[in-house]
Amino acid sequence: MADVIYQAQPPLEFIPPAFNPLFLRVVQLLLPTYINWQTAITQIEAENVEVLVDLYRQFQEGKIRFMLAFRHPKTDDPFCLSYLFSQLVPKVARSHGTMLQLPIHAHFIYDRGIPLWAGSYVGWIASNLGATPIQRGKADWTGLRSARNLFANGKFPMAAAPEGGTNGLSENISTLEPGIAQLGFWCAEDLQKAGRDQQVLIVPVGIKYSYVDAPWDAIANLLSELEAASGLPVNPSEFASVESLYPRLLTLAEHLLSLMEQFYTRFYHQKLPDAKTIGEIEDRNEALAVRLKALLNTALLISEQYFDLQSKGSLRDRCQRVEQAGWNYIFREDFKDVKGISAVERALGDRVAEEANARMWHMRLVESFVAVSGNYIRENPTVERFAETTLILWQMIAKIKGDKAVRRPQLGKQKVKITVGKPISISERYPAYQGNRLAARQGVAEVTNDLQHAMEGLI
């Protein structure tokens, strides 16, 4: 994250989408090379692409508007979807004799915070690709209006991650946010007001990563690094496998929990489950889950107490509120006119920004674990689940150490499978949605629930 985050600044500006067809052409030409050189991905395949081909045909004929609701386990997901658009959809369309207008693309909705930690150039790239940003944790009416307008009137379909962010787990879907469903109903409303009879659809898309060759040795080496960093003795396994590495992973997780529990009880005067209470839980995984839940709640409380926020809702909702509160302390309305601010006021503002960033650090730790359970590996002990869990622990340690590295270690070459699901019709549900506010809320909830089940079925 850039050092500028520690200084008080004017409010975050909206980055308007400014689609540049020439820039998209360059990106699509370079994309396969970029994926080969900059990611661990060696193969991308897709299932039910013909469904997407037909949807694009209908979209281009003016019959439908649709949004792709895609799984978001990793930051590589947009590259995979862009490959689907630029390579796989045109290929399948040609094989089926379907004429599509090129380019095949989508207007992505992305988190406005990404350019803050990934670099301002990312905002420029996203804008020129026709993407539109939104701020999490608040009613970002400017961002919502932009997304709503693109859904109804954009040159391309929409694409968004209903989970709201990455969770690092290919086979565990976070609880979906209702925004995708709400945008769908708004689109249906806008089309009706404009006298347009296009159908509105939401299309679930699954993305799943797997290793070409099981990287047990790389996982073992990473475990050794994490053990050394956390003060545990390093005892490399002679033969790396789930049987030999799982006890080490459990021991590492328990040790890290102990360190963090001491950190919060000693220096932040928080109360956590005592050893006697935990000792009564016979199963190690269950004990870990209980301790982790208590620790995550405590870490968020530290942030919430500073920003005077109520501790309500899911962990993800609480994280987003903390993030928005932190941004409000850093990106301030009263700093719009920097020239009119005295040196003392600026220095005080920087102090507030620095403290806000420090308090947000606790929330960043929690963010990595919002979808983690104590049984993810045990219920299906694959190398993918083991690697994902180990990488989450790596991310936690990296945040504690203050490492600036954005990218996770690459443990081995991966292949990606994208699955296009059955479209969910918003237009069919719109008459019931129109009834009253209660019916509208119920309609959004039902679509969100159906989308959740559909995406879980694509794993």
Residue ranges of predicted features:
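Membrane-interfacial terminal anchoring regions of lipid-handling membrane enzymes
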Residues: 1-104, 111-113, 118, 135-137, ...
